[in-house]
Amino acid sequence: RNAVHERFTEAMNANDLAGLRQIILDCEIACPISGTRNWTEVRQFNLMFSTQMGSTAEGASTIYLRPETAQGIFVNFLNVQKTGRMKLPFGIAQIGKAFRNEIVARQFIFRMREFEQMEMQFFVRPGTEMEWWNRWKETRMAWHRALGFGDDNYRFHDHEKLAHYANAATDIEYNFPFGFKEVEGIHSRTDFDLGNHQKFSGKKIQYFDPETGESYVPYVVETSIGVDRMFLQVMSAAYTEEQLEGGDSRVVLRLPAALAPVKVAILPLVKKDGMPEVAQKIVDELKYDYNVVYDEKDSVGKRYRRQDAIGTPFCVTVDGQTLEDGTVTVRHRDSMQQERVKIETLHALVDQECSYRKLFRKLNL
């Protein structure tokens, strides 16, 4: 077995396709499903999308769509560092499209040819990368757990086989209804990217460290989230079908309040007696700070159900008592409990529950 492994490694490193095929034939490797040994020739697959750029076919140039968003950060490292007067360690983050020419696009959104990435490249002094890699591992796990979908639903999966650019790598996996799948990767990329950009461009991409008096190519710790996977994680965790007393049921999207697209629904109990006008004034008070909807159609019960289904944390009902004492009924999405509050306290209530401050305080940063 060791001899075969050595042959395989040598053939892979030498890009010896004929040698790889000979190993398959010598070992009489069979397909585990069909049992056939009728293999095709060993071929190279290009996992980057190529296209043509140019106004005419004759003058067109071949270009490639980016397989990751990270390289734009590396190319602009010095620009950002100098204009921002940044000192190491610091990070540059972005979100954008990436493209992979997947051999077989499947596994729902886990193998797509076009997808959205959120990435951060964190630049550190060489020799400190493992300390920062471990710190970012814990920070990123804390961020995911702060969403409130259950600490036990997350785990680390450390890589046994590392990519050519990494000296450490781990994935954060979430327990989807169909099992654990990766949602984020944390990698120590060493100086591979900046070093190669410097090598092939012929331009210095180095940082002068005022503490040590040295110039060097920084090492990089990367965090990378698949936005599509993250969206699926949030939706699968939040979606709930509940059976209520009396035989009724409801669909509720238990989104973290900070992530809910609509924070508050303002509902006049009836479309008369001045209630719509008061409700609209409340909308005007809140709409500059939060995404607020106004809904006056159907019974208030049906309106509650509509807001539950899209994850709105609060429904505010304007009724006859509102006209008398300036109070409204606030209904909480998850518990369906209601409380009476003054109109002037609504902003503070929504801010306390829906602000990202509440989410980030859980990280203890």
Identify the residue ranges that each predicted region occupies:
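NTP/phosphate- and nucleic-acid-binding module
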Residues: R1-L365
